[in-house]
């Protein structure tokens, strides 16, 4: 039996996907940048329905930048990049590089659900692709513009002394972006490197290099150049995976504006000359058919409304156990958040003075979903201090939010934002300016229900904010402020996220409680037939 799913495969920010199959099960690793815990590991039985099974990475490194230790020190847009997921002789591997520490890390596990172990490698392997050959020797393809293949030692701790270490291709110096995001495979005795780039004057494309041996000449061919009729954003950067029946699929990603970089799936076969033939008639299909899973569908959602993931044997909350779809912005300061101090609520304590949302500790985030996501939460601001802000955000570099704030002993409801200077992907590197106020009113109570609607339809990329009395759920939603842009930029280098936050501008010690969170993603496209 086959099922048909429309692209994107998953309409959310899962950048730099790497997918492998072990037995009848597919596994995916994805970039998590500055969010903690990181390196999401997902599982699927049909390449369409995915569930979280682990975060392979607790933290990248215990540094001032990763901890948001002080203003001027952050890991935005850096952290955990481009994982390479492999399984070899009973061990699971994830290799990735962190640009803030300029270090490559290898994660290993006996079970993909964890626990995972972390160690550093000798050398820095940018956008690395791990590969085990038939003789168990390990290699990594890596680099930007200039791609190299480097043999690793048997301990996988660094380069093999005297081993293979060679340049396999050099991109055109005039390319808008050189080769990167590479994955290395072997099929029917040939070696394949999938890699993406921006040829001069073109969109993002995927190339494939093919050779008869790792020390032989690699032939290069563009294998897909298409934007799925979506605003010129090319589909690229990924690899290939087969089914138990021997069918092949290519997986890549596509920039989709404010929602981020989303996984794309397409059929693939090998041509008579050995090169992959990707898509349908040279194009990425709007929908793709895959074999239906022979087992029950996954039960763990990739988004949701619950804070708590599990309870202990006595029925109480396992402290610090959040659902896997929640991640903190940077390394959390655990003494300043709790799931147990107020039953059913996520509580934040103010632990330092911050100039704006980008510097706030313990902002709790969840991915938005295209084409539309709606988030609601009740915020109790009765124990805020003057100058505190607690609320619901469209969390990105040019953030916006609706929040309760305390001023001169009065509780106010405000919409604030960081202005978008232009639509380019480049950051203005302004982390410190205070937010701009769009609208502000007196709050009817210290406890209010807040709502954000994130609209990504056809790159509209706007968020609108609403409020109502928390004690009268039948009351109508009242809009506050104007619509705000959600622009994907390299400052955060991630899609816009839902954010629950508290920060102080005058004194520490304030408390905010968040409860009855509700997540919904009305999906206007048919996912399955």
Specify the residue positions occupied by each region the protein language model found.
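Carbohydrate-active catalytic/glycan-binding domains of CAZyme proteins
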Residues: 1-529
């Amino acid at each position: 039996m086959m099922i048909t799913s429309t692209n994107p495969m998953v309409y959310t920010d899962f950048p730099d996907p790497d997918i492998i199959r072990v037995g009848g099960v597919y596994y995916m690793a994805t970039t998590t940048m500055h969010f903690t815990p990181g390196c999401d590991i997902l599982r699927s039985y049909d390449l369409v329905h995915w569930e979280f099974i682990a975060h392979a990475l607790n933290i990248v490194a215990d540094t001032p930048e990763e901890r948001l230790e002080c203003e001027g020190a952050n890991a935005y847009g850096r952290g955990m990049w481009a994982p390479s997921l492999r399984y070899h002789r009973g061990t699971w591997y994830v290799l990735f590089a962190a640009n803030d520490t300029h270090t490559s890390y290898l994660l290993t596990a006996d079970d993909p659900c964890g626990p995972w172990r972390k160690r550093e490698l000798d050398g820095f392997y940018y956008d690395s692709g791990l590969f085990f050959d038939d003789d168990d020797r390990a290699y990594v393809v890596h680099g930007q513009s200039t791609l190299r293949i480097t043999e690793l030692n048997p301990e996988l701790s660094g380069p093999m002394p005297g081993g293979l270490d060679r340049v396999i291709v050099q991109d055109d110096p005039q390319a808008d972006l050189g080769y990167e995001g590479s994955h290395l495979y072997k099929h029917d005795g040939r070696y394949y490197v999938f890699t993406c780039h921006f040829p001069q004057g073109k969109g993002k494309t995927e190339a494939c290099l093919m050779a008869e041996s790792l020390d032989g000449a690699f032939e290069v061919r563009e294998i897909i150049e298409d934007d799925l009729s979506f605003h010129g954003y090319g589909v690229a950067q990924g690899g290939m995976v087969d089914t138990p029946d021997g069918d092949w699929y290519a997986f890549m990603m596509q920039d989709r504006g404010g929602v981020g970089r989303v996984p794309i799936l397409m059929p693939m076969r090998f041509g008579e000359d050995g090169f992959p033939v990707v898509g349908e008639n040279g194009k990425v299909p709007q929908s793709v058919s895959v074999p239906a899973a022979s087992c029950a569908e996954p039960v763990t959602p990739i988004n949701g409304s619950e804070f708590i993931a599990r309870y202990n044997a006595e029925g109480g909350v396992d402290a610090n156990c959040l659902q896997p779809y929640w991640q903190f912005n940077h390394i959390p300061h655990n003494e300043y958040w709790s799931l147990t101090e107020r039953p059913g609520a996520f509580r934040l304590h103010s632990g330092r003075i911050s100039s704006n949302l980008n510097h706030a500790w313990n902002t709790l985030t969840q991915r938005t979903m295209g084409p539309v996501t709606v988030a609601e939460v009740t915020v109790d601001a009765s124990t805020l201090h003057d100058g505190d802000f607690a609320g619901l955000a469209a969390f990105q570099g040019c953030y916006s939010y609706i929040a309760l704030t305390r001023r001169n002993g009065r509780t106010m409801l405000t919409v604030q934002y960081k202005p978008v200077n232009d639509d380019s992907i480049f950051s203005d590197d302004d982390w410190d300016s205070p937010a701009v106020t769009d609208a502000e009113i007196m709050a009817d109570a210290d406890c209010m229900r807040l709502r954000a609607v994130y609209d990504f339809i056809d790159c509209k990329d706007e968020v609108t904010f609403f409020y109502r009395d928390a004690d009268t759920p039948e009351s109508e939603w009242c809009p506050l402020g104007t619509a705000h842009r959600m622009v994907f930029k390299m400052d955060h280098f991630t899609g816009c996220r839902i954010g629950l936050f508290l920060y102080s501008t005058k004194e520490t010690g304030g408390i905010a409680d968040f409860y009855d969170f509700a997540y919904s993603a009305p999906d206007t496209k048919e996912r399955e037939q």
